[in-house]
């Protein structure tokens, strides 16, 4: 009886959310257009767009998008995030992951704003056009000179007090396993001497993914709309700076893999 009542309440809540879309969707479209215009103008006249305004605009847009999708972000261990610039290292299961993390950082008090490292192929999508508002770093993995230049850009962002997130698997991994971590993703933490925060995302796999791709990967979409963001214990630079980056990447991979397996079972 209790389960039936809970299911009914969830149904009612979702129904009310769908009903509210009549009002919310036009607002979202207007906010999206405004953000795209701001992103284009920011490239031309950056001095007119201070960070606090840009990050807040993106956070509000993302929050509304997740509301429309019916996604609830649950944060675990927020006290593990240092109140300063860090390198966030996360697993990657969905195109929704960056939005989930923007929401998680935006609603966690005292933590720095967050931006991302992304592959250059994504920079012309509507989502990552907006990400330019938060200084997303695009890298061309086929161009060594551009990658070297982007490393300086990453360090500059961290020096400005912004947290930087990287997905060291390099792509979305549609599997119940965590893909191999590439050690080069940690290089900026060594150069900028900042903490590494391992972060585990659970529940996002298959969201914003085509059925064809899911069938090809032979996996099912995560059920439900509750997505957990687990902040693991940060690693201070003094504890990894003299250690080979591949060993550090392996240790971070192990911790995220264990956390992912644990929360998938709960």
Swiss-Prot record:
It is an enzyme of class 2 (transferase). Its EC number is 2.3.1.51. Keywords: Acyltransferase, Lipid biosynthesis, Lipid metabolism, Phospholipid biosynthesis, Phospholipid metabolism, Transferase. One of its GO terms (cellular component) is membrane. A motif (HXXXXD motif) lies at residues 92-97. It holds the Pfam family Acyltransferase. It catalyses: a 1-acyl-sn-glycero-3-phosphate + an acyl-CoA = a 1,2-diacyl-sn-glycero-3-phosphate + CoA. One of its GO terms (biological process) is CDP-diacylglycerol biosynthetic process. CDD domains: LPLAT_AGPAT-like. It comes from the Bacteria. One of its GO terms (molecular function) is 1-acylglycerol-3-phosphate O-acyltransferase activity. Pathway: Phospholipid metabolism; CDP-diacylglycerol biosynthesis; CDP-diacylglycerol from sn-glycerol 3-phosphate: step 2/3. Belongs to the 1-acyl-sn-glycerol-3-phosphate acyltransferase family. Converts lysophosphatidic acid (LPA) into phosphatidic acid by incorporating acyl moiety at the 2 position. The HXXXXD motif is essential for acyltransferase activity and may constitute the binding site for the phosphate moiety of the glycerol-3-phosphate. This is Probable 1-acyl-sn-glycerol-3-phosphate acyltransferase. The lineage of its organism: Bacteria, Bacillati, Mycoplasmatota, Mycoplasmoidales, Mycoplasmoidaceae. The gene is plsC.
